[in-house]
Amino acid sequence: MNQLKALFFFVLSICSLHTAAQRIKGSDTVLPVSQETAEIFMNTHPEQRVTITGGGTGVGISALMDHTTDIAMASRPIKFSEKMKLKAAGQEVKEVIIAYDALAIIVHPDNPVSRLTRQQLEGIFRGKIVNWKQVGGPDMKIIVYSRETSSGTYEFFKESVLKNKNYMSGSLSMPATGAVIQSVSQTKGAIGYVGLAYLSDRVKPIAVSYDEGKHYVLPTMENGTKRQYPVVRPLYYYYNVSDKAKVRHFIEYVLSPAGQNIIKKGGYIPVK
């Protein structure tokens, strides 16, 4: 009987070694395409298990530090302060760009304003421009929706559009991209920002100019791929080098032609 028990637990341990459970956590921007890719990956690799949750880039990187995730999804590069914490903990982290994303500026569909310069966007999100009539629209108060400070999208927008200046104190922070879409779709004076893959007919994307109004470009897959749209960013996976063997197969699949095709179909810009 003892020999049978020993054999059972030996077989169980071998099975567990071949079922590599991977935990992925972080950016809500990267979340949908990671979920879609993981589902197809597990269908073709039944020995692999992948669980994915959002929460924001900062949450994902913190989980990587705490060893409660194997891969951190991020919509911004890892910060110097985060690198120092990882280094102090003896962790060496690898960065992988898995896709690119165009960050769309959105308004309510009934808003007649269809284009804005970067300077106008900066004025709006910093609270210097407070009424749509100041940018050629109707006499209507501007309601600013943003993301929480733990969001990589929040950080990227601040860097690219606000040129690292502070957001206005009265902006409404949303916990996820879906909440931004919902809020803007229900508020006529609203403005917000979301990843290209989240766009729907519930909101209206506007054309953006980074050359003081000489050229305005809409956020589309084509314009993002050609880098004609000015607000494009990389999307990342981060993992501990010590976990490379565990995460390698999934990351290789994401970067493969099949994985990059899923990324493109999901509304993201492939790296290859």
Feature-to-residue mapping (PLM):
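Bacterial N-terminal signal peptides that target proteins for export
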Residues: 1-8
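Hydrophobic h-region of N-terminal signal peptides that target proteins for export
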Residues: 8-20
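Exported/periplasmic ABC-transporter solute-binding proteins
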Residues: 21-272
